[in-house]
Swiss-Prot record:
It comes from the Bacteria. This is Acetyl-coenzyme A carboxylase carboxyl transferase subunit alpha. It comes from Rubrobacter xylanophilus (strain DSM 9941 / JCM 11954 / NBRC 16129 / PRD-1). GO terms for cellular component: acetyl-CoA carboxylase complex. Pathway: Lipid metabolism; malonyl-CoA biosynthesis; malonyl-CoA from acetyl-CoA: step 1/1. Coiled coil: none annotated. Signal peptide: none annotated. Gene3D superfamilies: 2-enoyl-CoA Hydratase, Chain A, domain 1. InterPro entries: Acetyl_CoA_COase_a_su, ClpP/crotonase-like_dom_sf, COA_CT_C. GO terms for molecular function: acetyl-CoA carboxylase activity; ATP binding; carboxyl- or carbamoyltransferase activity. It is an enzyme of class 2 (transferase). Component of the acetyl coenzyme A carboxylase (ACC) complex. First, biotin carboxylase catalyzes the carboxylation of biotin on its carrier protein (BCCP) and then the CO(2) group is transferred by the carboxyltransferase to acetyl-CoA to form malonyl-CoA. Acetyl-CoA carboxylase is a heterohexamer composed of biotin carboxyl carrier protein (AccB), biotin carboxylase (AccC) and two subunits each of ACCase subunit alpha (AccA) and ACCase subunit beta (AccD). Belongs to the AccA family. The lineage of its organism: Bacteria, Bacillati, Actinomycetota, Rubrobacteria, Rubrobacterales.
Length: 320
């Protein structure tokens, strides 16, 4: 339970207790109805006024649907491919040939795992160089077979351990970016949770970038930013505000194409609704780009990223 969800949790527990007692007393239904209305109002009040850092906390929620949940719900078929053909495999990133709502694609995603064992195996979604080299290999296969690339991004960032650095972490990510910039097929990306730094960027340099409304995309985690800038990690909420890392901030700045709605209370409250929203977006976007020629795709992709980072001059303070 997140700290700001405590009032919601208390109401839920009170309602559950009254439901338990309702069999013994018939005079509790009115109180249950009143508390259920209060619960709905509390959810709406809290979740329509989340701060940027609270959205980061929601994006990290352990019960939030992960890559496996989306894969299992959206894919009619999925044939996983493993290994980078250089060093080994990396369970933090999974990908392969898939069929999503009748359309053949190459599906790639960060895998945070579903239980303790799989989370440790997948390093909590923090990929090593071999993971990013596997991703590049999958981009190449998509180009060879003319299949759209679909990526589901959910990572705190690329793993920064000594072994990863020795095996060329930064190089592997840069190779992914180069491959994505030039791959002659549609690239559709959705950030479903965390979008941490280069580890996320290696999979979201796309023709379409969507974000679930409580996901984030940032060059650095708020806690790390606060430690560096303020010398105080407890100022993470302040750092999150300054980083402009929320889906709505990034949509406003032209980085993100669409903010996908989550159920009230976050994706972890109703995973099926969140997965359905992502599935509908993927179906719509893939249908829209399916007829594009490689030349048009690359031209639009280039123009898209040239626009990001542009600025406008604002009038200065009046001299009067």
């Amino acid at each position: 339970m997140l700290d700001f969800e405590r009032p919601i949790k208390e109401l839920e527990e009170r309602i559950a207790e009254l439901h338990r007692l309702a069999g013994e007393s018939e005079g509790l239904q009115a109180e249950i109805s009143r508390l259920e209305e209060a619960l709905e109002a509390a959810r709406r009040r809290i979740y329509t006024n989340l701060s940027p850092y609270q959205r980061v906390q929601v994006a990290r929620h352990p019960e939030r649907p992960n890559f496996r949940a989306y894969r299992d719900a959206l894919c009619e078929d999925f044939y996983e491919l493993s290994g980078d053909r250089h060093y080994g495999d990396d369970a933090a990133v999974r990908g392969g040939f898939a069929r999503i709502r009748g359309r053949n694609v190459v599906l790639i995603g960060h895998d945070k795992g579903a239980d303790v064992k799989s989370r440790v195996e997948g390093n909590f979604g923090m990929a090593h160089p071999e993971g990013y080299r596997k991703v590049k290999r999958l981009y190449g296969l998509a180009a060879r077979f003319g299949l759209p690339v679909v990526t589901l991004v959910d990572t705190p960032g690329a793993f920064a351990g000594r072994g990863a650095e020795e095996r060329g972490q930064a190089w592997a990510i840069s190779e992914d970016l180069m491959a994505l910039a030039a791959v002659p097929v549609p690239v559709v990306s959705v950030i479903i949770g965390e979008g941490g730094s280069g580890g996320a960027l290696a999979m979201c340099l796309a023709d379409y970038l969507g974000m679930l409304e409580n996901s984030y995309l940032s060059v650095i985690a708020p806690e790390a930013c606060a430690s560096i800038i303020f010398r105080d990690s407890s100022r993470a909420p302040e750092a999150a505000e300054a980083l402009k890392l929320t889906a709505r901030d990034l949509k406003e700045h032209g980085v993100v194409d669409e903010v996908l709605p989550e159920p009230l209370g976050g994706a972890h409250r109703d995973p099926e609704a969140a997965i359905r929203a992502v599935g509908e977006a993927l179906e719509r976007v893939l249908a829209g780009v399916s007829g594009s020629s490689p030349e048009d795709l690359l031209k639009r992709r280039y123009a898209r990223y040239r626009r990001i980072g542009s600025y406008q001059r604002l009038p200065g303070p009046s001299s009067g």
